[in-house]
A protein has these predicted regions:
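N-terminal glycine-/serine-/threonine-rich beta1-alpha1-beta2 phosphate-ribose binding loop
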Residues: 1-121
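Active-site loop of classical SDR/Rossmann-like NAD(P)-dependent oxidoreductases
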Residues: 49-54, 329-340, 357-360, 380-384
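Short, well-ordered coil/turn segments that N-cap beta-strands
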Residues: 123, 150-151, 178-180, 261-265
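Short, well-ordered amphipathic alpha-helices
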Residues: 22-32, 55-60, 165-171, 251-254, ...
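Beta-strand-loop-alpha-helix segment that lines the small-molecule cofactor/substrate pocket
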Residues: 101, 107-159
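Predominantly a Rossmann-like dinucleotide-binding segment in NAD(P)-dependent oxidoreductases
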Residues: 9, 153, 158-244, 251, ...
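Contiguous beta-strand/loop segments that form the cofactor/metal-binding neighborhood of enzyme cores
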Residues: 209-310, 325-352, 364-369, 389-393, ...
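Glycine- and charged-residue-rich phosphate/anionic-cofactor binding loop of Rossmann-like
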Residues: 352-384, 404
Length: 406
């Protein structure tokens, strides 16, 4: 199995943080369990400097995981591999043989371009959120994916969080009644736009980078259709720092269920939380129904750590946590699961040789999809949140007017 990872930033390797990210630890755990005989991970970065920093992270992660490379084949390659050499993911796509799949973790505005080229090379592709920024681009990718009989997923890991699965179970069982409103508060530390994403933060906004998770979640829980959206944003702190993007955005989305019941989702998102906040993300969701309520504080997971060496911490052991097992490190959580299930699905699909058969077609998509976790987000489903983002961005540019969602 040969995996191409496009992007080597914070979420991939933990570059710029004291962690190892989520994508590479997920790949480690996948290979630890499966012990695939021929296994290679190819990292494609933007420049040699970033690759060198990420390479140190990757090699250290392998070391502390105590994977015995003499018993488990685990080859890693990095491009560009020489200073002043302009090797890109395009060169790898063109020249590398027998790639199994691609994981795309690049800045938001590059998603369409990179995913499109992966599909051009017949690669099953997992992309981090958001899927695309424009609905027309989402449609093009869906059409190409279906025409080529390959598979595409978007890594909306909030669907795998047991907090949210409990909400879905309660909703599906009709214990909460008909939906009236969803209220979401979601924010991250200033370090994210100011340092970690400084080179491209001005090309995105907090709604499409972060808030989109909970747009997708409302669709996942209710299977409702978004009807219209209104968005209001504030530019203050980040603009003074020379980053021309919104500090905070408030968004109201009107949804309609299959039984024509309308309800609203209110999103309040920002990425200017103090850097000494007790967690990277502050996140709360409240569902109000005609028969009951559901509340989830997804920052306060019931754990608080205080020590002389660090400030107060409230870790989230459910997302992606490094645990010590004897003398080795293992990573567990729904963030890990969202990626390992994609890799497991690709492996099963490859073994079934779906691409070279007539098995995959529109009418049998559910059969094809069974090789993935039911929480997985297909390109088709991810296009729902893309449509909301596109309308919300139009609202921000048009005096916060209501915008119909196509």
């Amino acid at each position: 199995m040969k995996i191409l990872v496009i992007g080597v930033g914070m979420y991939v390797t933990g570059r710029g943080t004291n962690t190892f990210g989520t994508i590479f630890p997920s790949i480690i755990e996948f290979q630890r369990i499966n012990k695939i005989k021929k296994f290679e991970v190819i990292f494609a970065g933007r420049n040699f400097s970033n690759i060198q920093k990420s390479k140190k992270k990757v090699l250290k992660a392998l070391k502390i995981s105590k994977i015995d490379l003499s018993k488990i084949n685990f080859k890693v390659s990095f491009y560009p591999n020489k200073k002043n050499k302009k090797q890109t993911y395009k060169d790898i796509l063109k020249n590398e043989k027998n790639l199994s799949c691609a994981i795309v973790a690049v800045p938001d505005h590059l998603h369409y371009q990179v995913i499109n080229e992966c599909l051009d090379h017949d690669l099953h592709t997992l992309a981090v959120k958001p899927f695309t920024i424009k609905t027309k681009d989402a449609r093009k990718l869906i059409e190409k994916k279906n025409k080529k009989k390959i598979f595409g997923l978007v890594e909306f890991h909030k669907r795998f969080d047991k907090h949210n699965l409990l909400l879905k179970n309660a909703y599906d069982s009709k214990r909460l009644g008909a939906p009236l409103s969803f209220i979401v508060e979601y924010s991250q530390k200033k370090i994210v736009p100011e340092e970690l994403f400084k080179t491209w933060a001005y090309k995105t906004n907090i709604l499409q980078y972060l808030g989109v998770h909970y747009v997708d979640l409302v669709y996942f829980v209710t299977r409702a259709t978004p009807v219209r959206v209104l968005a209001i944003g504030q530019k203050n702190w980040l603009k003074k720092k020379g980053i021309n993007t919104y500090d905070s955005i408030q968004c109201i989305i009107e949804w309609k269920t299959k039984s024509n019941i309308k309800f609203t989702q209110t999103l309040s998102v920002n990425w200017i939380d103090p850097n000494n906040s007790t967690a990277m993300s502050t996140q709360k969701i409240k569902f109000l129904g005609t028969k009951g309520n559901f509340e989830s504080d997804q920052k306060a997971r019931g754990i608080k750590i205080v020590s002389d060496d660090t400030h107060v911490e409230e870790p989230n052991p459910d997302f992606n946590m490094a645990f010590q097992e004897g003398n080795r490190t293992e990573w567990r959580g729904y963030g890990i699961q969202a990626i390992t299930q994609f890799l497991s699905g690709v492996r099963k699909i490859k073994n079934k040789n779906f691409i070279n058969s007539n098995y995959y077609n529109k009418s049998k998509e559910d059969e094809f999809f069974k090789y993935f976790n039911f929480s997985s987000t297909s390109f088709e489903e991810a296009a729902i949140s893309t449509a909301v983002l596109e309308a919300a961005n139009k609202s921000l540019k048009n005096n916060s007017n209501w915008q119909k969602i196509k």
